[in-house]
A protein has these predicted regions:
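A glycine-rich dinucleotide-binding beta-alpha-beta segment and adjacent secondary-structure elements
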Residues: 175-187, 406-470
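Active-site-proximal substrate-binding core of FAD-dependent oxidoreductases
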Residues: 246, 489-500
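A conserved FAD-binding loop/helix module that cradles the flavin
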Residues: 466-488
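Mid-domain catalytic core of redox enzymes
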Residues: 242-358
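Rossmann-like flavin
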Residues: 98-193
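N-terminal glycine-rich phosphate/pyrophosphate-binding loop and immediately adjacent elements
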Residues: 2-128, 132, 442
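C-terminal segments that line or cap access tunnels to active or ligand-binding sites in enzymes
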Residues: 314-421
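Helical element adjacent to the flavin cofactor pocket in flavoenzyme catalytic cores
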Residues: 200-252
Length: 500
């Protein structure tokens, strides 16, 4: 059975859906193929005991009025379909080091003023650092779109600059250094490799305007999927791509699916991990073996262990902040040091509010984890990993809950149900190697090997997703626009988004 479309998109995460919305709005006949029964990828939410939990994206920056993520949401036509709530403007994040808590406010000036009061000897350096963060962050914005550019490429040289060293050059106090390093958890940053461009994009967007997605991030995915369908698009679920068939004319000929379907299109966009995508491509002399070998050997960022808690009603007051709880003052994940110590690394704790906004109805805890800690179950799949795996998960969850209890008194006694997910869970749902949370490691010391262009050697095969540009919601959104610009033109697309 052969089906023909203008655009065929592999994967329905934020990247795939964004490309689907953009191109379907331009009149292209779009088809998205998703291996799971539910669209969304890392936007997926799930419900347990009538409580919603997000799986991959827990809050989104630059979502305030006239900010870049809100502008894209408006352009997609889903702004009125999702409900957002600003995180506490005085404490969008609360950094916990030893017994002290440090609150990070929204707004660059407020950020510098508040931390400058606590670390007066570093206020000038902090001011310079945050100015640089916001300069990089502002390289994407509505003004750039109005000028016909998706981003200001002149600042992308910061990809070759160390995030950790840049912080250290501006800040002397080690505690403040680690407070500022907390954002590394949101893009998979490691002290030895993290680049300043990714750091600034993620941190800057949250300083600008971090927001909760009420009702769960699945509402974003569902709303975007509905726009695609309303524009005449097709979304196929519960069906995986098994082969990308190439022709002798340097292009993709069609896609093969797990149910025997053949999907033909003018253009093909893969939002899957590049290691997965190129494994699917039929051998062709156009894509050289050295390139394929390089892609296969690239290192991926760490995965996350997640604990989801339902709570007794009206027991824990809702705290409109995201807690980052650091062990031994260090906010940077050290894979070698944390081997065999699952649950003891930096921990993020967040709450979902009840309908009246006064109480927490659930809590989510996430922490980075070393791949060697779950390597015993690498060759297993969901619901078939055995009792040892369940015991290990329970042990890790208990460690994390015990640590969270120190900043949220009464948490343990308020728990009614506990659910867990390891990187293997994410691997099986998102098809990401090792369950990596943020895809390929982008090493500032040698960025070229992990610089993945949106255009492949195959004329009509494009890439999108967090491995191409910057991880996280804002990076994936920008990358999708860059991918689609190959088809409809950057200036045209940028100005349309700006005018939405």
């Amino acid at each position: 059975m052969t089906e023909k479309y203008d655009i065929a998109i592999i994967g329905s995460g934020l990247g795939g859906l964004s490309c689907g919305v953009i191109l379907s709005k331009e009149g292209f006949k779009v088809c998205i193929i998703e291996q799971h029964s539910v669209v969304g990828g890392c936007l997926q939410s799930f419900k347990r005991n009538n409580t919603i939990f997000d799986t991959g994206i827990h809050y989104i920056g630059s979502m305030g009025k006239e900010q870049i993520m809100r502008q894209f949401i408006r352009y997609y036509g889903v702004d009125d379909k999702i409900k957002t709530m600003s995180v506490d403007s005085d404490a969008y994040e609360t950094i916990c080091i030893d017994s002290e808590q440090y609150q990070l406010p929204i707004g660059a000036k407020q950020f510098v003023d508040k931390l400058g009061q606590q670390f007066p000897e570093d206020k000038l350096g902090l001011s310079h650092l945050i100015s640089k963060v916001m300069e990089v962050k502002n390289s994407i914005g509505i003004e750039q779109l109005r000028a016909g550019h998706i981003s200001d490429a002149s600042l992308q040289h910061y990809i070759s600059v160390s995030a950790y060293q840049t912080i250290a050059e501006h800040i002397n106090n080690p505690i403040l250094q680690n407070i500022l390093g907390s954002s590394s958890l949101l893009f998979g940053g490691e002290k030895q490799t993290a680049n300043f461009y990714h750091y600034a994009m993620v941190m800057g967007s949250n300083i600008e305007g971090a927001h909760h997605i009420l009702g769960g991030t699945q509402t974003i995915a569902n709303a975007m999927a509905n726009v695609i369908k309303q524009n005449g698009g097709t979304i196929i679920t519960s069906e995986a791509i098994t082969n990308i068939i190439t022709s002798r004319t340097n292009e993709v000929q069609y896609l093969k699916t797990s149910k025997g379907r053949e999907i033909k299109a003018q253009y093909y966009i893969s939002s899957a991990h590049p290691q997965v995508t190129f494994d699917l491509v039929e051998p062709t002399p156009i894509i050289k073996k050295p390139f394929l070998n390089r892609i296969k050997t690239l290192r991926n960022t760490y995965g996350m262990f997640s604990v989801y808690l339902t709570l007794k009603r009206q027991t824990i007051p809702f705290k409109n902040t995201f807690y980052f709880i650091h062990a031994n003052q260090s906010s940077w994940f050290d894979e070698d040091a944390m081997k065999g110590r699952s649950g003891e690394s930096s921990l993020m704790l967040s709450f979902r509010p009840s309908e009246d906004g006064k109480w927490a109805e659930s809590a989510t805890l996430i922490t980075p984890i070393s791949p060697c800690d779950y390597s015993s179950w690498t060759n297993t799949h969901i619901n078939h990993r055995g009792s040892d795996y369940e015991m290990w998960k329970k042990s890790v969850a208990n460690i994390m809950i015990s640590r969270a209890q120190k900043v949220c008194s009464g948490l343990s006694d308020a728990i009614t149900h506990i659910y867990t997910a390891s990187p293997l869970t994410f691997r099986d749902y998102t098809f990401t190697p090792q369950g990596s949370a943020y895809g390929l490691v982008k090493n500032y010391q040698n960025p070229l090997p992990t610089t993945i262009p949106t255009q492949t050697k195959l004329r009509n095969l494009l890439l999108t997703g967090q491995n191409v540009f910057v991880p996280g919601a804002i990076g994936v959104t920008m990358t999708a626009a860059m991918t689609c610009a190959n088809i409809i033109g950057e200036e045209y697309l940028a100005k349309k988004i700006a005018e939405a």
